[in-house]
Amino acid sequence: MLIREILEESVQKFGEVKAVKWLNRKEVLERSYSEMLRNVISIRKGLLAEDFAGKHIALIGTSSVEWIESYLGIITGCITAVPLDAALPCEELIDLINRSDSEALFLSPKHRPYLEAFLANCPKLQKVWMLQEEVEDLPSGVYSINELRAMGKSAAEDASCPDAEAIATIIFTSGTTGKSKGVMLTQNNLASNVEAVKISAEPGTAMLSVLPIHHAFCLVMDWLKGFSQGATICINDSLLHMVRNMS
């Protein structure tokens, strides 16, 4: 079974269950499994229409519903996702974008100050999508996530299901003992890790995601495993607020 199949099965079982909850200032926002899958499919179809099949796409940002929907839109098609540490300095992010052969980028609004440097120093970058629904005054080649979703909604063709041995994601090591290295994980690597951990949770069980989302453990055990159980993943916006958010 692939992540795409795990996600589709979860939506069939838990469609109206809340998949993600997060804080927007003081307001708690939610997105159901059905709503999330619709966005994932729109992103996936949009990327196919933009001719990114078989290519590498980087993501830079902290945990957000836009981040995880974009990641799933990438890996459930025939594209390789490259999640990068949002806390790295601009120069290191440029190096990782280039070394990973990423040809597109999903970027959080917090990292917009880096945008000009990325466009100037990452020659393979063709397009950048901001992980924000409404964005103004964007330079050429930069778009909002809403524009990609809209393209996907109007596209007739969907991406085929990826091969089990295709590279789903490249996750870079921390680089504490030298230059960070990109670890290639296949579709089967991700799915088998999700299926190998035997835990049971009632649909709608609230799970607080604390670790940075680009970490392999956080991605697989918090998000992908949680989705397989029909859990509600609650985004912790800051370690300083963790106790408050748990309540």
Show where each model-derived region lies:
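Flexible, low-complexity linker/hinge segments
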Residues: M1, E116, E136-I167
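AMP-dependent adenylate-forming
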Residues: L7-R31, E136
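Conserved pre-ATP/AMP-binding loop-to-beta segment of ANL
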Residues: G15-K18, M130, A150-F172, K179, ...
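Conserved AMP-binding/adenylate-forming
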Residues: L29, R44-L88
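Conserved AMP-binding A3 loop
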Residues: E30-S34, A168-V194
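Conserved structural elements of the adenylate-forming
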Residues: L37-S42, A155, V183-P203, M207-V210
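Structural core segment of the AMP-binding/adenylate-forming
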Residues: T76-E147
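Conserved AMP-binding/adenylation subdomain of ANL enzymes
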Residues: A191-A206, I213-S247
